[in-house]
């Protein structure tokens, strides 16, 4: 999709605060500092619309980005950040679970995993959770510009084996630096949201 119009509409922690205009929604989840904001910025062709940070745990609410008045990207709180209190982690978990299990507008989940490493227990738990609730998943391996392209297939195999990856889902290697994988991500989003591509 060629993006000209995007708006960060709201931050929410409860269903009563979600948008009410019935547009399809794509959630983005991942470990703190995995690159969710960088992916969003690349998808919408902005350098810093979604604020990136070297400080993990910055996203603490569900952030709704309306794109071309056709869909929402929903940036959910990152998980696995040790310096966030146990109580705060539990709160984040409740916010995410309530959204993913009860939101009728949700069309799919983009699960971001650091492509340089094996998935963490939290990464695996998120994937298993999504599959249990029959949420379509696109697994995006991020930071792939840190790895030589000759090793991408090996890393993909490692990640898929750790997740017990379901072939019905989609997997893509992504680089925020080069944009590799961007078009594949958009194709999946357009398919899930039943909107026409204008790349």
UniProtKB/Swiss-Prot annotation:
Residue ranges the record marks as coiled coil: none
SUPFAM superfamilies xrefs: P-loop containing nucleoside triphosphate hydrolases
Molecular function GO terms recorded: GTP binding; metal ion binding
GO-annotated biological processes: division septum assembly
InterPro entries linked: G_ENGB_dom (IPR030393), GTP-bd (IPR006073), GTP-bd_ribosome_bio_YsxC (IPR019987), P-loop_NTPase (IPR027417), Small_GTP-bd (IPR005225)
Sequence ranges assigned to domain EngB-type G in this UniProt record: 22-195
Co-factor(s): Mg(2+)
Residues that bind Mg(2+): 37, 59
GO cellular component: cytosol
Binding site for GTP: 30-37, 57-61, 75-78, 142-145, 174-176
UniProt-listed Pfam families: MMR_HSR1 (PF01926)
Keyword vocabulary terms for this entry: Cell cycle, Cell division, GTP-binding, Magnesium, Metal-binding, Nucleotide-binding, Septation
UniProt keyword Magnesium present: yes
Family membership: Belongs to the TRAFAC class TrmE-Era-EngA-EngB-Septin-like GTPase superfamily. EngB GTPase family.
Free-text function comment from the UniProt entry: Necessary for normal cell division and for the maintenance of normal septation.
HAMAP family: GTPase_EngB
UniProt-recorded name of the protein: Probable GTP-binding protein EngB
Annotated organism of origin: Latilactobacillus sakei subsp. sakei (strain 23K)
